[in-house]
Every structure is written in C-alpha cells, then in structure tokens.
Design a protein with these regions (language model features):
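Acidic glycine-/aspartate-rich tracts in secreted/extracellular proteins
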Residues: 64-68, 129-130
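Short solvent-exposed strand/turn elements
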Residues: 117-134
C-alpha cells in the first residue's frame, strides 16, 4: 500500500476514542416521533398526540484502508459491541459535531473501478438519542508530541507543532520497525491509534514493518484528545518511510 486515502473536509468518525475513518458523506440518524392514539369514546374525531422519539439507522461512506483500524468494524459487528459513536467536524465547524450510542448493524465493501478510491459503507443502529457536542474540547499542550521509532530516532514534524494545528507530516528512517508517539495535554483523555495514553508517556508501539510500509509509503496515525460532552481534538500524523 503506497498511500492511504485522504479527503479534504477533515470530518472524522470515532468510536470510544478510536478514530475509525475520514468520512466522505454525512448521514445523521433520521428522527421520527411516535404517533399515539389518545381518542376516547366521546371524542368527536380521532385524537393523536406525540409520543416517544425514535432515531433510525445511520449509514456512513468512508475511504477504505486495509488495516487493523477498519478491520475493527467487523470485529465490533460480530461481537455485537455497543459504544459511543462521535461524528467530529473540523474545528471551524465544531458546533455541528454530535455523538450517539449504537452498534454496527451492517458492512458493505465497494470494489473500485476506473481508478476510483476503494470505499466502505457501514450502518450504525442507535440505541439512544443524539447528543450535540458543541463545545471545543481540550487540545495538546507544549511540547505537544514526540514521534519516534524503536531506536529511538525522533522525527522532525512539519509544520511546527501547535495545539491548534491538526495535520502533520514527517519522514521515518528506512530501518524503522515501530512507531511511538508521546503526547502532552494538561486536561482530557488522550488516545493514540485508539489506545488510551497518559500525558508525557510513550504510546503503545505501532507496528511499522518494511513489508507493510515500503519506501515512500505513508502510515497515518491519529491522536485524539477528548473530554466530557465536548468536541474531541483530532490530530493526523502522516509518516512517510524514508530512503536512509
């Protein structure tokens, strides 16, 4: 795999702190209001009152990446795992983000034709109601993060690290076999590649073999900083395997 699909909007789908994919469309759960018949025997006409709210299935189309991140979707489906799904908009539109509890109820892969990107459709069935997450959440703080390999070789990041810059690139060594990221945040819960990581502590090593990521290929790693009922901050790091 020489690259990973990437879209421009910066919208992410996360599950329990694990960034699963960048989305290519938005599908909020359809909302219906139950109609309750309250007609009595002496009513001159049928009386209907509003009842319980009901949210329908959400179907998402995402760029397909053949790695453990999206393989987790099938694992969740077969295990009937229920958790909190978060649709995370870019920071400028953070007030549109929302979360909803639910489970994976359908998965469909699409075969690409004529150089179109491979995509995957999957359906989430809500088990409760939608909660808007309109407040911006915590961010990384100085020194933000350190990205390094097993030696360790510390990778130079571009652009300069900042709590409010959300996309970075760097180049690894040719001989790098694993990647760790040490994040720093004064508040919030930090996840690196889906694994909860304490501030100032190296993440679980991310496998980075030459066979899986040959020279020139790109590994994308997400760092997510979350809080309670706030929009998570998502940082995307693209690591290109170097030639030296």
């Amino acid at each position: 795999m020489t690259s990973q699909a990437k879209m421009a909007t910066g919208m992410f789908l996360a599950f329990n702190g694990y960034v699963l994919a960048e989305m290519t469309d938005i599908s909020e759960p359809p909302l219906t209001v139950e109609k309750v018949d309250s007609t009595s025997h002496d009513s001159p006409c049928k009386i209907t009152i509003p009842g319980q709210l009901s949210y329908g299935d959400m179907t998402y189309t995402v760029n397909f990446v053949n790695d453990v991140t999206q393989a987790a979707l099938e694992t969740m489906a077969t295990a009937r795992t229920t958790g909190m799904w978060q649709v995370i908009f870019p920071p400028a539109f953070a007030s549109l983000s929302y979360q909803v509890p639910g489970f994976v109820s359908g998965i469909k892969k699409k075969t690409p034709l004529k150089s179109n990107p491979a995509q995957r459709d999957f359906t989430v069935t809500p088990t409760g109601g939608i909660t808007p997450i309109t407040t911006a959440g915590p961010t990384l703080t100085t020194p933000y993060m350190v990205v390094e390999d097993q030696v360790p070789n510390i990778f130079a990041m571009s652009p300069a690290l900042s709590g409010t810059t959300y996309q970075y690139t760097c180049t690894s060594k040719q001989a790098s076999t694993s990647i760790t990221i040490t994040p720093t945040a004064l508040t919030g819960t930090i996840y690196v590649a889906g694994n909860q990581t304490a501030t100032g502590v190296a993440s679980t090593a991310i496998p980075y073999t030459l066979a899986q990521y040959p020279t020139g290929s790109i590994l994308t790693v997400f760092v997510l900083v979350s809080g309670t009922n706030v929009t998570p901050s998502v940082y995307e790091i693209q690591i290109t395997r170097g030639t030296s």
